[in-house]
Amino acid sequence: IILEQLASSYAVLTDDERELGVCLVDIGGGTTDIAIFTEGAIRHTGVIPIAGDQVTNDIAMALRTPTQYAEEIKIRYACALAQLAGADQTIKVPGVGERGARDLSRQALAEVVEPRYDELFTLVQAEIRRSGFEDVLAGGIVLTGGTAKMEGVVELAEEIFHMPVRIGAPAGVQGMLDIVKNP
C-alpha cells in the first residue's frame, strides 16, 4: 500500500521539483488532496473536502439543470476564470422535467464556477501556510485531476498562489499516451 499522493508524485513531478519544493494538488471528484515535497521527500499532506463534484453541484443548482447535464456542461464548456470566457459564446442548458432548454453565455457559467475554484485554492493556500513550507516551494504548484484541466484553472491558481502553476501529466510513459496523459 502506498499513499496516493506519493504514487501520483512519481508520475507527474520531476526530481528537481521534489528536491526544490513543490505542492501537488490533486483535484478529485469528492476531495482535493495536497502533498508538499522538499529535499526529495514528502513533508506534508492534507485533504480538502471541496472538489469537482461541488463544482458540478453548483452548476446544477445555479442553472437549474439535472446533475448529469451539469457534469457534461462542466467538462465541455466551463471556465474557471470569468474574464477568459466569452460573453458572446452561448451554450444550451437542458431544463428540469418538462422545462425546455435555454441559452446561457459561457461567461455566466464561468461566474458560477469561479467562486468555487477561488474558495478551493484559498483553502489550499491556507493549508500550505499551515504546513510551514510556503516559502520553500521553488517548484510552485502542480495540479492534477480531471477538474484541473478546465480552462482558466492555471491562470486563477497563479493569481491566488502568486507562484508558478502547471498541469501535471504522466512523464516517461510509452504507448497509449493520449489515454494516460489526462492528469
Model-identified regions with their sequence ranges:
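Residue-level detector of high-confidence beta-strand sites
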Residues: 45-47
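Conserved phosphate-binding loops in N-terminal lobes of ATP-dependent enzymes
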Residues: 120, 127
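Nucleotide/phosphate-binding catalytic cleft detector across ATP-hydrolyzing
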Residues: 1-24, 41-42, 52, 63-115, ...
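A contiguous, mid-protein "functional segment" used to position or interact
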Residues: 182-183
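A short acidic Gly-Thr/Ser loop motif
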Residues: 24-31, 37-40, 51-52, 145-150
